Amino acid sequence: MSEEAPKHEAPSVISPIENEEKGLAPKPLERVPPNGGAKAWACVAGSFLLQFCSFGYVNACGIFQLYYQETMLKDQTSSALAWITTLQIFLLFMFGPAVGKMIDVYGCRRTLPPFSIGAVFSVCMLSLCTKYWQVMLAQGVAFGLAAAGLSLPAMATATQWFSTKKGLAVGIVSAGSSLGGVIYPCMLPRLIEQVGFASAVRWTALMQGILLFIANLLCSSPYPPLGRASKEASAEKDATEPTPRRSGLRGFKSLPWGFFVLGCFFTMWGLFAPLNYLPEMAALHGYQSFARYTLAIANAGSLVGRIVPGWVSDIIGQFNTMCIVTSLSGVLVLAFWLPLEFHTSLAGIIVFALLFGFVSGGFVSLGPPCVVSLAEDRVDEIGVKLGGFCLAIALGALTGLPIEGAIKDREGNKFTGLMCFAGATMILGGVCTGTARVFKGGPRLMKKV
């Protein structure tokens, strides 16, 4: 009587179909980031270039404002010229989250090329512009939309590769916009002097085309795009297994969230005033040849400000750090920039540009972590709240600079009213952010929030 040898069975793998037959809920596809590797850091480098060519170009707004004011569009008011910059920033933040969702669904390989082509095309069209409405369409609308498809999605693409190194990756990527704010203000005025505005802008378009081509080659995602199939599968699952959902709008009713969004809105009312008007102020006070470098100095400070406040926030908390940088931004304008209107010095302009660049860089880098903290890591609320945050930023940017330009137009070549408005609104933004911090973490000052 022969005995059968014991069989060593391999562990069974239950397919989603078998799960469904047995009444088990199908497990979602696990997406574990590689957290490093050659492709991951190549994607970080590519995203750095995307930021350099998009938000970095927008950071050179003061140079364009100065050139338009003095040469090409002398018949336009400061308020009218400010709409060019504000429209870029508004479109960048308004449509950035939507493009980020497109990258999730279709992948960066399909999404980034059209926006890269659009960015280069809009800069080429700017070189042909001679009238205000043409500049508004080419630089304000066309480049603003293209930048929306490159800047915020650059962050999303790079962070997909990391789990524990996301902070470092975001810091490197966001530094691309600050470096752009250093390079463009130094490069463009020199080119304009040598070859004229049209040729200078075309050379810029050529440089951006080369860099964006490299960026598109380097950027990739560790996961396959979700596509429409996952949407249909999710809808089918919801139909067969209905589960109660919490509305994403529920989070908007919380007091911490309301005050935080209000604080971001007021801060954006004043944040771009020094970046847009500091070169013009330096030129009017006798530093014409140095005016072009004020933006480069401010963005050099911002380069450090993107990283250091993030490191500090790991120690004392994101909200505590956010309250400090927003309030300091307003205090610097009122206590440092405003006196320079009456007692102008080259050293004072340099120090103010560095300090303000540092604290304003902290506001830009700390916003998204505060949003995640307010959502309490609930995935169903992070996207909605990030969209609300971007909407507040966009509306603040859209209305802030034109208001400040209108104030300046009433005062002629003086910046006193503009400075008071910008400083007061940023301090008000700091107060609102501080109120949100108290509602979220309590009144104890030393608590990490």
Swiss-Prot record:
Similarity remark: Belongs to the major facilitator superfamily. Monocarboxylate porter (TC 2.A.1.13) family.
Top-level division of the source organism's lineage: Eukaryota
Transmembrane segments: 44-64, 80-100, 112-132, 135-155, 168-188, 195-215, 255-275, 296-316, 322-342, 346-366, 387-407, 415-435
Keywords in alphabetical order: Membrane, Transmembrane, Transmembrane helix, Virulence
A GO CC term assigned to this protein in UniProt: membrane
Lineage: Eukaryota, Fungi, Dikarya, Ascomycota, Pezizomycotina
Protein name in the entry: MFS-type transporter hasB
Gene3D superfamilies, per the entry: MFS general substrate transporter like domains
Loss of function: phenotype: Leads to complete abolishment of hexadehydro-astechrome production.
Induction context: The expression of the hexadehydro-astechrome cluster is induced by glucose. Expression is controlled by ambiant iron conditions in a hapX- and steA-dependent manner.
GO molecular function per UniProt: transmembrane transporter activity
Record keyword Oxidoreductase present: no
Membrane topology: Multi-pass membrane protein
Subcellular location field: Membrane
Coiled-coil portions: none
Known function: MFS-type transporter; part of the gene cluster that mediates the biosynthesis of hexadehydro-astechrome (HAS), a tryptophan-derived iron(III)-complex that acts as a virulence factor in infected mice. Required for the production of HAS.
InterPro entries for this protein: MFS, MFS_trans_sf, Proton-linked_MCT
Main localisation: membrane
